[in-house]
UniProtKB/Swiss-Prot annotation:
Protein name as it appears in the record: tRNA 2-selenouridine synthase
Pfam families associated with the record: Rhodanese
NCBIfam families: PRK11784.1-1, PRK11784.1-3, tRNA_sel_U_synt
Active site residues per record: 97
PROSITE patterns to which the protein is assigned, alphabetical: RHODANESE_3 (PS50206)
Domain Rhodanese: 14-137
E.C. number(s) listed in UniProt: 2.9.1.3
Source organism per UniProt: Salmonella paratyphi B (strain ATCC BAA-1250 / SPB7)
CDD domains referenced in this protein's UniProt entry, alphabetically: RHOD_YbbB (cd01520)
Function per UniProt: Involved in the post-transcriptional modification of the uridine at the wobble position (U34) of tRNA(Lys), tRNA(Glu) and tRNA(Gln). Catalyzes the conversion of 2-thiouridine (S2U-RNA) to 2-selenouridine (Se2U-RNA). Acts in a two-step process involving geranylation of 2-thiouridine (S2U) to S-geranyl-2-thiouridine (geS2U) and subsequent selenation of the latter derivative to 2-selenouridine (Se2U) in the tRNA chain.
Lineage: Bacteria, Pseudomonadati, Pseudomonadota, Gammaproteobacteria, Enterobacterales
Catalytically driven reaction(s): 5-methylaminomethyl-2-thiouridine(34) in tRNA + selenophosphate + (2E)-geranyl diphosphate + H2O + H(+) = 5-methylaminomethyl-2-selenouridine(34) in tRNA + (2E)-thiogeraniol + phosphate + diphosphate; 5-methylaminomethyl-2-thiouridine(34) in tRNA + (2E)-geranyl diphosphate = 5-methylaminomethyl-S-(2E)-geranyl-thiouridine(34) in tRNA + diphosphate; 5-methylaminomethyl-S-(2E)-geranyl-thiouridine(34) in tRNA + selenophosphate + H(+) = 5-methylaminomethyl-2-(Se-phospho)selenouridine(34) in tRNA + (2E)-thiogeraniol; 5-methylaminomethyl-2-(Se-phospho)selenouridine(34) in tRNA + H2O = 5-methylaminomethyl-2-selenouridine(34) in tRNA + phosphate
UniProtKB keywords: Selenium, Transferase
InterPro entries: Rhodanese-like_dom (IPR001763), Rhodanese-like_dom_sf (IPR036873), SelU (IPR017582)
Biological process according to GO: tRNA wobble uridine modification
Gene name of the encoded protein: selU
Length: 364
């Protein structure tokens, strides 16, 4: 363990997907964690709050004594067994608390008493977090090329095919539109930023990187927003625009939002509950933009959606969804994106069908 306890290269730890046994309270972990970290707290939220109050009123020694009283006996043993099991599963892992202080040192000492020598992250999560922020800022200074195009143009697929492509929507677990949620909940803002930083570091380490290829995104992807340093660079970046036939875009959207999402919901929850969740997902997507559609148009499209769902449930056909998807694209999504693109017209360096854009990227 001695070599692992020397001055730590935080970037190397992140690049290596180093397992982290994060002993912070669940609320701290939920607010922000590193990719692949597992949360096995020394103290739960109420215990941590009690110790914090004691620290403010009576000082460090009293708080430490209270912590040991709260985490003792069977509770201590149960948590110790969980840490031991985690270390046996991840023998190259590290302990991590907020700043590399009391909590990780206490767990390290308790493990050592059982014969396990587990290193800890010096500086804790805060040090790793700062490394992630600095890495994103530094790597965002490299040239960026954006892939643009209306909804259903296959932009995400194109980005994923590039060795220097960064799938921002995949990292955010959201596809950007009001229908963009997936079955996986979005990460907290800090966790999303940490995951993005690690992805940038990994791609940069794999190759001599001339530039990043990213999808042309707004400030936010669902509940997550892009780091300002990256957003500022994207605002100035050149754009290659995918211009595919409307019918081809419809087929991509049919596959993504009706066929695949129905499959994913029923696979996760079973036929009946999955159908209910799928139906609610589509209704929620439409409801989210009701004010922009106008309440009368929203009501009309909702009725059409209900009929399409009834048809899909009875026959399996998704054709009925085109009756509300087509006007939604024509009246809302396409005009909105084209308006946004017009403001960046000077940045457009290439236009063409999906395959032409793919070939152009390959030639760069």
């Amino acid at each position: 363990m001695q070599d692992r306890q020397k001055a730590q290269d935080y970037r190397a730890l992140l690049l290596a997907d180093t397992p982290l046994i994060d002993v912070r309270a669940p609320i701290e972990f939920e607010q922000g964690a590193m990719p692949g970290a597992i949360n096995l707290p020394l103290m739960m939220g109420d215990e941590r709050a009690a110790v914090g109050t004691c620290y403010k009123r009576q000082g460090a020694d009293a708080a430490l004594a209270l912590g040991h009283r709260l985490v003792c006996g069977d509770i201590r043993q149960q948590r110790l067994e969980a840490w031991k099991a985690a270390y046996q599963r991840f023998p190259n892992g590290y302990l991590c608390c907020a700043r590399g202080g009391q909590r990780s040192h206490i767990v390290q000492r308790w493990l050592k008493e059982t014969g396990i020598d587990c290193p800890l992250i010096e500086g804790g999560y805060k040090a790793l977090r700062q490394t992630a922020i600095q890495a994103t800022w530094q790597l965002a200074q490299k040239p960026i090329l954006l892939i643009g195009g209306c909804t259903g143009s296959g932009k995400t697929q194109l980005v994923r095919q590039q060795p220097n492509g960064v799938d921002l929507e995949g990292l955010a677990r959201h596809r950007g539109s009001s229908f963009g949620r997936t079955l996986k909940p979005q990460l907290s803002q800090a966790s999303f930023e940490n995951k993005l930083a690690v992805e940038l570091l990994k791609i940069n380490a794999r190759q001599t990187l001339k530039r990043w290829v990213l999808e042309d995104e707004g400030r936010t992807i669902g509940a997550n927003h892009l780091p300002e340093c990256l957003r500022e660079r994207m605002a100035q970046a050149p754009i290659a625009v995918v211009e595919d036939p409307f019918a081809l875009r419809l087929e991509r959207l049919r596959e993504e939002y009706f066929i695949r999402m129905h499959h994913d919901f029923t696979h996760a929850y079973g036929d009946e509950a999955g159908w209910q969740a799928y139906s609610e997902y589509l209704h929620h997507g439409l409801f989210a933009i009701r004010r922009r559609l106008g309440l009368q148009r929203f009501a009309e499209l909702t009725d059409t959606l209900d009929r399409a769902l009834a048809e899909q449930l009875s026959s399996g056909s998704t054709d009925g969804h085109m009756a509300w998807l087509v006007p939604l694209l024509n009246e809302y999504y396409d005009p909105m994106y084209r308006y946004q693109l017009e403001k960046k017209a000077a940045n457009i360096v290439f236009r063409g069908p999906w395959q032409d854009v793919a070939n152009w990227l390959k030639a760069q």
